[in-house]
Swiss-Prot record:
Gene3D superfamilies: 3.30.300.10, 3.40.50.880, HUPs (3.40.50.620). This is GMP synthase [glutamine-hydrolyzing]. It catalyses: XMP + L-glutamine + ATP + H2O = GMP + L-glutamate + AMP + diphosphate + 2 H(+). It comes from the Bacteria. One of its GO terms (molecular function) is ATP binding. InterPro entries: Class_I_gatase-like (IPR029062), GATASE (IPR017926), GMP_synth_C (IPR001674), GMP_synth_GATase (IPR004739), GMP_synthase (IPR022955), GMPS_ATP_PPase_dom (IPR025777), NAD/GMP_synthase (IPR022310), Rossmann-like_a/b/a_fold (IPR014729). Keywords: ATP-binding, Glutamine amidotransferase, GMP biosynthesis, Ligase, Nucleotide-binding, Purine biosynthesis. Catalyzes the synthesis of GMP from XMP. The gene is guaA. ATP binds at S235, G236, G237, V238, D239, S240, S241.
């Protein structure tokens, strides 16, 4: 088996919103990469031994005092370097060029760059041709500052009307800088540029693919675990499901999955999990029916964060109880993925912003004397899904819309009761079913129903009814950081509303949430 980690790219993060996207694009090309904070040490870079280094973008100004800089060793490591946006600016400034602060003439959004001279990075790519026969590229810009003088040994490769150095290169040292963002889809030839850098300039083979990742993960799991037993909290979500399948391939019956039914799942979800993993795939699953325990613990609590903490605490208690029954289990498996690792990493100097501390199963008891197994910790979510498909998990399960960890606990507004959860489950199932039937499910990023703790007067036949209200929510988004409400057809919404009111006894009114993010969040709680 080839070593899929032998050839790799190091990406240094200066705080750009696009940095993880760069890493995902490099992985899509078939090359392993890791994303580290910009203030990494020379020793760490030497130990990692990358075939190439990418300096990512960032929000700060190179002209500002104490702004982030690439480690000097980056330019002495003898490997190709690609600077993107801020990365190009700090490369230029650190190697003797000049950067000037933007004063009202930055470039944001679509731009067209004209390629001035041949470069390995731009080899045989163009979107159009200028009147003078020069290649033109459609790119995405997001910068205020700009390079005003390039370092000695560099040539200007591309320009725009307002940016004389939209790209630069030192072909002898294989140093390249681009002021635009090749990682975003708006830069039409961006993927080919990154392919040129990773595959041709850095010489990495394209061997990072699902089948190779699975083979590597199974070998490493066997080596790590040996003949020991492992326990896994299986939720039925993407991450824990893929972990379960990998471990089952690696160690078979030495894996015990604990599935906790908290009474806050979607319609028939608990049975679907048991049918798929227990009956179909033959995994060893302990099914804990804990609906009453969770609902009793949340009784009288209406505050969202308090509900989340209660749900988390009760889960930990139950998982601890079940793990003690698995007396031979030496390892705890978790579905930690690479973005979790990145967000927890922080920065040596404190300059890089640490978004949150992360632990996949938060608050597990300190006396749980087990080793940790995290087979997905190198992978992005899209990679986890592709691996799941390769392992035989169904597409609909891997690509369904996100579902919050606390489940219906945060989709029933206010106090959570069994009656409310049962009504919400039925209404939500109708909404999702109709989205599938209308071929709309995969055209929205997330869709769900929310139970509102208010009653409304309705008319059924000759009688009046005073029943509950639900809200439908559907959004379109790329990254879930911002979102637009989905403009679903009126006749579709009418059909869903009619079905819910007629088929779910206890709901008298259906509304549609037309709030964007911001100012609203996607979930109501």
């Amino acid at each position: 088996m080839s070593n899929i980690h032998e050839h790799k790219i190091l990406i240094l993060d200066f705080g750009s919103q696009y940095t993880q996207l760069i890493a995902r694009r490099i992985r899509e090309i078939g090359v392993y990469c890791e994303l580290w904070a910009w203030d990494v040490s020379e020793e760490q870079i030497r130990e990692f031994a990358p075939n190439g280094i990418i300096l990512a973008g960032g929000p700060e100004s190179v002209t500002a005092e104490n702004s982030p800089r690439a480690p000097e060793y980056v330019f002495n490591a003898g490997v190709p370097v690609l600077g993107i946006c801020y990365g190009m600016q700090t490369m230029s400034e650190q190697l003797g060029g000049k950067v000037i602060q933007g004063v009202g003439e930055g470039e944001f959004g679509y731009a067209q760059v004209e390629v001035q001279t041949e470069s390995a990075l731009f080899k045989a790519i163009e979107d159009a041709v200028s009147e003078t026969g020069k290649p033109l590229l459609d790119v995405w810009m997001s910068h205020g500052d700009k390079v005003s003088a390039i370092p000695e040994g560099f040539v200007a490769v591309a320009k725009t009307e307002t940016c004389p150095f939209a790209a630069m290169a030192n072909e002898d040292k294989q140093f390249y800088g681009v002021q635009f963002h090749p990682e975003v889809t708006h830069t039409r030839q961006g993927k080919r540029m990154l392919e040129h850098f990773a595959l041709e300039i850095c010489g990495c083979p394209a061997n990072w693919k699902p089948s190779s990742i699975i083979e590597d993960a199974i070998e490493r799991l066997k080596e790590q675990i040996g003949d020991d037993e492992v326990i896994l909290g299986l939720s039925g979500g993407v991450d824990s499901s893929v972990v379960a399948m990998l471990l089952h391939r690696a160690i078979g019956d030495k894996l015990t999955c604990v599935f906790v039914d908290n009474g806050l799942l979607r319609l028939n979800e608990a049975q679907q999990v048991m049918d798929m993993f227990g009956d179909h795939f033959g995994l060893n699953i302990v099914h804990v029916d804990a609906e009453n325990r969770f609902l009793d613990a949340m009784a009288g609590e209406a505050e969202p964060e308090a509900k989340r903490k209660i749900i988390g605490r009760v889960f930990v208690e139950i998982f601890d109880e079940e793990s003690k029954k698995c007396v031979n289990a030496k390892w705890l498996a978790q579905g930690t993925i690479y973005p979790d690792v990145i967000e927890s990493a922080g920065s040596a100097t404190g300059k890089a912003h640490c978004i949150k501390s992360h632990h996949n199963v938060g608050g597990l008891p300190d006396d749980m004397a087990m080793g940790l197994v995290e087979p997905l910790r190198e992978l992005f979510k899209d990679e986890v899904r592709k691996i799941g498909l390769e392992l035989g998990l169904p597409y609909d399960m891997l690509y369904r819309h996100p579902f919050p960890g606390p489940g219906l606990g945060v989709r029933v507004l206010g106090e959570v009761k069994k009656e409310y959860c049962d009504l919400l489950r039925l209404a939500d199932a109708i909404f999702i079913e109709e989205l599938h039937k209308a071929d709309l499910y995969n055209k929205v990023s997330q869709a769900f129903t929310v139970f509102l703790p208010v009653r409304s007067v309705g008319v059924m036949g000759d009688g009046r009814k005073y029943d509950w209200v639900v809200s439908l929510r559907a959004v379109e988004t790329i990254d879930f950081m911002t979102a637009h409400w989905a403009h679903l057809p009126y006749d579709f919404l009418g059909r869903v509303s009619n079905r819910i009111i007629n088929e779910v006894d206890g709901i008298s009114r259906v509304v549609y949430d037309i709030s964007g993010k911001p100012p609203a969040t996607i979930e109501w709680e």
